[in-house]
């Protein structure tokens, strides 16, 4: 994920620089309607492919922005400051000074898992057709049983529903069908399909056409992939495929249209990779409107799916361990939601994105992405329990599946096979597994991530 996206998502190959996040600034972010002018003299224009450290400023479309997290917007991804509020805060309209902003190049980006934070990644394109979002039957009536939570170690990868080779993002391998035998052949046993289109009213569409030749798997193909050993989840969100969490009507429409897709296509679970629009109230014991509506969505989906239907989450670090720095706005916004579903047993595992931003320990300590030290501090914090305003949020090791970039270029904070091995072996098999953005990125550079993790897991 993840911005993956995501993840959630496509990021440039440069490692993100270490930098402390600026939570206080986040809470005071200016809105697009701000009328006071600010000086932009000497401030560089925002550009893709440049690493912006936390706290740095840039101008874009006549406005001044400040980076909330260190980030490197990938070329062609469309991660402009106004499109990525998890990464930038708007300080106001420029008074006339500053450098004109370049026009972002256009290509189909990859999210997470975005990886944002992932900063998650894949804008939702305007569908070329408008099929019914609630089909009532599968071609040929093909169905297959729901798979339970995997009992052993997992290697979870995001499957891209677009062509990353055709758009030049990872030329070595573009779109592949979900039934491609190389996926399980290189160690992946959980696949997260990214991402459906979400319309402004909450309607969810799972359809062909993200790029020429790209097709979503049929129900029969989903069953074929599952028979080959895969557990398959549908990922919701990413950096740009957001949902209006301020509206309960939108939340209800989302549930009403995603449940038929989950059933028709034989998905085993849902992955929550919401990277925009979720904020905390400042009081961890009082849900904000957006938090309440995300819970409304999750509960609505789980209530209509069979018992044992899976739930995973792939938030960026700011939304989870960032709560050790401060609680409010995006900082720690996932914490009440994670706690709810860990405590009630419904969360299969947490896929926090250990990339595209700082990693945090329980004391507000900050570490650069891509370091074993940061990986360990953050993982231990969740297992021990992060205490925020007297409330403890604990995610035990066996419910942690940390997310890492599959290859250099897939996300900031890439860890090579040796560092991944050091991080994994710290826990002597105690972690449930690892997640990566993305399967397609891994395949584009020889599948080294999957092969390494499979060996580490002894599979």
Where are these regions (language model features)?
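Tryptophan-rich substrate-binding surfaces of secreted polymer-degrading and adhesive proteins
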Residues: 3-9, 24-136
């Amino acid at each position: 994920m993840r911005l993956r996206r995501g993840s959630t998502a496509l990021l440039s190959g440069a490692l993100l620089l270490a930098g402390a996040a600026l939570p206080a600034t986040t809470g005071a972010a200016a809105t697009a309607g701000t009328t006071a002018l600010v000086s932009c003299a000497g401030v560089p224009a925002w550009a893709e492919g440049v690493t912006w450290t936390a706290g740095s400023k840039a101008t874009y479309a006549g406005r001044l922005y400040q980076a909330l997290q260190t980030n490197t917007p990938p070329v062609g991804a469309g991660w402009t400051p106004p499109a990525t509020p998890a990464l930038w805060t708007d300080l106001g309209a420029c008074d006339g000074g500053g450098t004109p902003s370049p026009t972002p190049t256009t290509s189909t980006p990859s999210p997470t898992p975005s990886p944002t934070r992932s900063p998650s990644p894949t804008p939702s394109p305007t569908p070329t057709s408008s099929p019914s979002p609630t089909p009532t039957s599968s071609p040929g009536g093909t169905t297959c049983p729901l798979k339970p939570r995997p009992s052993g170690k997992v290697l979870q990868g995001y499957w891209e529903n677009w062509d990353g080779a055709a758009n030049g993002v990872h030329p070595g391998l573009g779109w592949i069908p979900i039934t491609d035998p190389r996926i399980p052949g290189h160690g992946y046993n959980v696949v997260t399909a990214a991402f459906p289109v979400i319309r402004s009213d909450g309607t969810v569409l799972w359809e062909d056409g993200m790029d020429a030749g790209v097709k979503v798997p049929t129900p029969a193909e989903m069953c074929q992939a599952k028979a080959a050993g895969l557990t398959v989840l549908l990922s919701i969100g990413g950096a740009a495929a957001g949902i209006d969490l301020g509206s309960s009507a939108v939340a209800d429409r989302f549930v009403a249209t995603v449940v038929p897709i989950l059933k028709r296509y034989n998905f085993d679970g849902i992955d929550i990779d919401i990277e925009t629009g979720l904020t905390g109230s400042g009081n961890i014991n009082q849900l904000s409107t957006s938090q309440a509506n995300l819970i409304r969505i999750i509960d609505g989906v789980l209530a209509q799916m069979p018992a044992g239907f899976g739930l995973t989450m792939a938030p960026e670090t700011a939304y989870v361990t960032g709560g050790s720095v401060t609680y409010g706005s995006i900082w720690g916004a996932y914490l009440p939601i994670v706690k709810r579903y860990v405590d009630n047993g419904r969360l299969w595992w947490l896929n926090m994105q250990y990339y595209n931003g700082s990693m945090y320990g329980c004391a507000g300590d900050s570490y650069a992405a891509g370091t074993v030290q940061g990986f360990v501090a953050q993982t231990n914090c969740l297992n021990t329990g992060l205490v925020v305003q007297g409330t403890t949020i604990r995610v035990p090791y066996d419910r942690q599946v940390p997310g890492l970039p599959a290859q250099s270029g897939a996300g900031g904070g890439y860890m090579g096979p040796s560092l991944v091995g050091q991080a994994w072996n710290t826990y002597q098999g105690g972690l449930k597994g690892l997640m990566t953005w993305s399967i397609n990125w891994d395949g584009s550079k020889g599948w080294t991530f999957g092969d390494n993790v499979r060996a580490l897991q002894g599979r």
